[in-house]
Amino acid sequence: MHNFVKTLFSVLLLFFCSVLTAQNRMNDARDPNRIWLDSEVTHHGDYQWKMMKAGDTTDPGEKISSSDYPTEKWLPAIVPGTVLNSLVYNQKYPEPYYGVNNKIESKLIPDISQVGRDFYTYWFRTEFAVPQSFKGKNVWLQLDGINYRAEVWVNGNLLSTINGMFIQDYINVTDFVKIGKNNALAVKVYPVDVPGSTKPKSWGAAGEFHNGGNGNIGLNTTMLMTVGWDFTFMDGIRDRNTGIWKNISIYATGKVALRHPFIKSELRKPDYDQARETVSVEVINSSTSNSGINCKVKGEIVGENISFEKSFRVIRGEQKLVTFSPEEFPQLVMNSPRLWWPVNKGPQNLYDLKLTVSVDGVICDSVKTRFGIREITSDTKTPDKSRVFYVNGKRLFIRGTNWIPEAMLRHSDERTYAELRYTRQSGVNLLRMWGGGIAESDYFFQLCDELGLLVWQEFWMTGDTRHPHDKALYMSNVESTVKRIRNHPSLAYYVASNESTEMTGTPELLNQLDGTRGYQMQSECAGVHDGSPYKQVNPMQHYENTASPRGSRVDGFNPEYGAPTLPTVEILREMMDEKDLWPINKEVWDYLDGNGFHLMTTMYTDLVNHYGKSSSIDEFAQKGQLLGAINSKSIWEVWNYNKLDYGDRFCSGLLFWYHNCSMRQVASRMWDWSLEPTASLYHTANSLEPLHAQFDYLKNTVSVVNDFYRSFDNYKVTAQVYDINSRKVFEESAAVNLPADGVANDALTIRFPDGISQVHFIKLILKDKKGKEISSNFYWRSNDKYEGKTTLTGPAASGFEDLSKLRASKVKLAYKVREEGDNYFVDITMRNTSNQIAFFNQLQFLNAKMSPIRPSFYTDNFFSLTPGEKKTVTIETAKEKLSEGAMLVLKGWNIDSQKYKLK
């Protein structure tokens, strides 16, 4: 067993390294045998989409969807996309994410609540050719998502109506398309039935801003945050994201088609050494023959020497569910299965299931899906009745966050990949799909499977909005979504709503469709308490557990607990005019902060000023990164300390509020909307590394956290303290034995010498029993006394003005560039050659315009180097991002900037 865990540990480290150097992963959902009708505009697809306001033409759908219909007066359209996205692209309206352009009082972009639904009701149209290879087959048109209702016309024929944002529709267009010729597709898209008003209501979730406008947006099954929320625009998105927001594709099958394959795993306990697999798939006979069809479905688990088949008859128009059970097919009992594990707990083993259906020996259709074998359960058998999760029988401490979708659905594979790669780098292990958002893409779930990220899925109801008025529509959207995502091992938990209730029948439907995952009615029940804090507080309050006005929140399972970070100065310059940046224009900054919700122009600014008053936006933004780093580090490390049974109180999980920025905002998180990381990403990644030494600003103690399912004995943690002149004034070490998935709390106490400088620094080093450094950590601290939660005082919060007295340091930098496939790497080695600490250094990868190349992936950033210390960092980006040149920059608090032209 000892050799096994050593091997597992090595595998985990190798996997972690490979994850962070594997760019441009293929989107497996993009079947190359399909015709994908992506627009030329924005998506670089092959199809010219056009759009026109429905009220601006009197032509009927029959005419608009004819192949010779003139569209010279129509506008280019973005598909997938929304009406407003296309109107902004065509310069009909200004960029909503800039300054106060979107502010309803600015009257630059009409709000649907004021101009009515017809204003944003649009026709979308394109033409496509059906290849000769489709001749004699059934041709299908698949629409993955339209918001909110739609008429689908092909060659003059109304073939379908779509209702609800999360429905996948499959339309048999065989009798209506022309093989080898141009065909016309026209989709008339209607906005949500009840757009709601951005005016606040008198009711809502306790202690929060007036989110969700007047609440009526909730009468629809849609993306509820479009009417306004405090983490985005409080006055919402003007068209409520009306449009064809997901892909449209065309494919062909034989007489019989397959859809919605599902594979269920039942693991034998307690050893989890055997899996019983149950496979099911829907078989669709869309032929017009009255005689029915004899067909055969064959299946295999690829590479495992497991195959199975079944013959049966499907009558005209029948949609038959065919099931293969392990009782009927013993080969579906798998011994010693390779289990799937989340971040840090084991490898992300995945299998492929392939199914075909044939008639008279000729294959009509095939489907393939990936799956993982694992069991995820939870219970409330804890000291405080809080919910705790288990993976494959082992307890899992949740270090999660709340995923927020892009506000205007400006999605791309590049954005999805970058955000999930940053997520994996951060060490987070679960993403909550917050109930006012969306159900994410197949590519999103594919990457979560590969990266070991668990997903908590909610279903589009919140406590700030009313409930859907059409229950059948809501339930059909839930059904469509569950069938789409249920094979993903990353999908861990179902929750009906955010801070609300459930639609009657939801748990029964989920059990019928899946039955392998846990469920709770809403996000704050059944062992999950209510959240907070949400905005800036004194970082000392996290250690004291007084950060929330609702009382203790560092305990049990907290679904929403977080703090903001200022974006970097380059990004701030992209979101508003220079005159609004400095001095800070409170109106503009507050609008880009959910009407000031996160206190960026008040408390955040006050705390930044504790590093010394700034004279420019550049100086303010640099200091703002220091505060953002402390915000993230203090939250994660206090939860580390209280992990499960090891701290002052029982904690089973935290979901940081919130994960990603839905639009440009001055209150960002680990990265901003433009995919440029902040200091919070790297300080979160440090805090959530699997073996981690950390300092408590309130207790002055050092603890060591272990996130692996194995113990580590005879490790050594060392604490060093340096004064403002970089003299080492304290050093002490302690031996630590790290329990499996546990914490060695208060391993040593730092005794700060009398007369130590007002500002000083702490370096923590963790070494294994052979003396090899495993991890390190770095803090800045002041002598200020913490005077309580109503103040902005304390050694993590105030008294940092003397940082300006840091003497100059020198860092020697060397780099090498290399190319692998489509990717470009810069391998950087740095060494502090001076006797002074090089404080808070930032590497930048810039283009010729001195703008950050995005997305780029840095293995570390915003770091400090003690005298003589060495560090290596690798930066990676796609080669296609280098068309405007590339420059490497190193800058820091007390070093001279260095610039190197790379291309």
Predicted regions and their residues:
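Active-site-adjacent substrate/metal-binding segments within catalytic domains
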Residues: 85-130, 134-142, 148-155, 160-161, ...
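Carbohydrate-binding surfaces of carbohydrate-active enzymes
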Residues: 281-288, 585-861, 865-875, 884-888
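Short glycine/proline/serine/threonine-rich loop/turn segments at secondary-structure transition edges
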Residues: 134-137, 177-181, 195-196, 330-350, ...
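Accessory beta-strand-rich segments of carbohydrate-active enzymes
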Residues: 24-35, 52-56, 86, 114-258, ...
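Extended carbohydrate-recognition surfaces in non-catalytic/accessory domains of CAZymes
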Residues: 23-142, 223-247, 251-256, 380-381, ...
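Bacterial Sec-dependent N-terminal signal peptides
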Residues: 1-26
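Extended acidic/polar, glycine-enriched regions
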Residues: 178-182, 282-381
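Substrate-binding/catalytic cleft of secreted carbohydrate-active enzymes
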Residues: 430-596, 610-613, 623-637, 641-653, ...
